[in-house]
Amino acid sequence: MLKILNNSLDGIVLGQQKADFDDVILNNPNYSLEFDRKHKIQSDSELITVSSSRNCDEFSLNGKVINFSNLEKFLEEEDPLIEVSDEENYFYIFPKYNLVLYVNYKDNLFLQILIYDESIRDLYDNKGKKYSDFQKSKLRNPTLNHDKLIFIPYK
């Protein structure tokens, strides 16, 4: 199970310099690491995002297990920002945790779990609409059900 604790994912801490990581972590196919580009010496670059490259059905966030049986409640409590992808998967952005979840509801999988550094917060936090607003708009506009064909008779 993936573990997110403060600003780390499975013990990989944001803000660490590239030189602090060994080749095992840098080349691990389960994680994608992104370093800043503001340093001339590449080994001085700091980690700004880390994401899981594997699909999972649950993860731990500061000791709380999040899975598909409690995801809806978690979303209602946290009211994240939301975006819908072309494939009808959902991106949830949690500014409070510097966390992005890419969710596939058809297969009940978290396709990507990403944490980001404070230095790039504005790249993530200004996108999408609030989860609560998105839910209200779904109730007002029932034609958002993309799985169903709805016929509206001409009057």
Question: What are these language model-derived features?
Answer:
Residues 1-155:
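Short helix/turn-capping signatures at newly exposed starts of structured segments
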